[in-house]
A protein has these predicted regions:
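Auxiliary tRNA-acceptor-end handling modules of aminoacyl-tRNA synthetases
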Residues: 1-257
Length: 257
């Protein structure tokens, strides 16, 4: 639940969501009109989509921690020594933000998220600044707009401004052309399924996109790399018919627009 009081924004987070994995995605709703656009430039258009990035909220004492799970390894066994001991020292989460608890009930906590939504890289375009060639942030022109909550996700709309300076071709002592670009973005924070998909290793005979993880399970003293495929969560609508080998529709079909 979102509450607004003047310039302050608060989120009431149920205890049932603390520790649950969520993902953050960013969509450009309105892009800036730039004077010169590189021909090989891939991003910077309305509808461009960035992410996802995985996060979770955890409560420690009177603080709520926004953490980023480190998902680059598998097979770490707390009961083993060797490289497993070194892996445990790194931990499984990276701390991103600390939010003091403003109030709490028996089943939820209230935190202020004004600064988080305005300045944290997870909720703005900063991680994609190189691709977008945005320049310096003009903080005074940034605004958090409409925030909509749904059962499994929340949408945050905001305006972002950046100052861009283009220097003369070939260098020299001349001053560059300086101007401001303005963007409207939509950030989606959505709850991931509590039961993750079973990990499937890459097969060279099947053309899936894949990603690599460091595998600690093969040896106490040596690391190996395992490639996992990227796939959609397709659950058969009629499991019995699917088990008989019949063609069935998924519960949530993939829709392309």
């Amino acid at each position: 639940t979102t509450y607004r009081q003047g310039e302050q924004i608060f989120w009431e987070i149920p205890d049932s969501l603390l520790g649950c994995d969520m993902f953050v995605t960013t969509t450009i709703l309105e892009s800036a009109a730039v004077k010169k656009r590189d021909e090989d430039r891939r991003y910077g258009y309305s509808g461009d989509f960035f992410g996802p990035m995985i996060v979770c909220f955890r409560k420690e004492g009177d603080e709520v921690l926004l953490q980023v799970p480190l998902c680059d390894r598998v097979g770490v066994d707390p009961g083993k020594g060797g490289i497993h001991h070194v892996a445990r020292q790194r931990g499984d989460f990276m701390l991103n933000e600390v939010l003091p608890v403003q109030a709490k009930t028996s089943s939820s906590v209230l935190v202020e998220v004004s600064r988080l939504l305005m300045n944290n890289p997870l909720f703005n375009l900063s991680p994609f600044g190189f691709e977008l060639k945005m320049g310096m942030v003009e903080s005074k022109k940034n605004r958090i707009g409409e925030i909509k909550g749904f059962p499994e996700n929340i949408l945050i709309r905001s305006s972002r401004s950046f100052s861009v300076e283009e220097y003369p071709v070939g260098g020299g002592n001349g001053f560059g052309d300086r101007y401001t670009t303005s963007w409207e973005i939509g950030v989606c924070l959505a709850l991931l399924p509590r039961q993750p998909l079973e990990r499937r290793q890459k097969n060279r005979d099947v053309g899936y996109f894949s990603f690599s993880k460091t595998d600690f399970s093969k040896s106490r003293f040596a690391l190996s790399q395992v490639s996992c495929v990227k796939r959609w969560r397709l659950v058969p609508r009629d499991l019995e018919a699917y088990s008989r080998g019949e063609l069935v529709e998924p519960e949530k079909p993939i829709v392309f627009y």
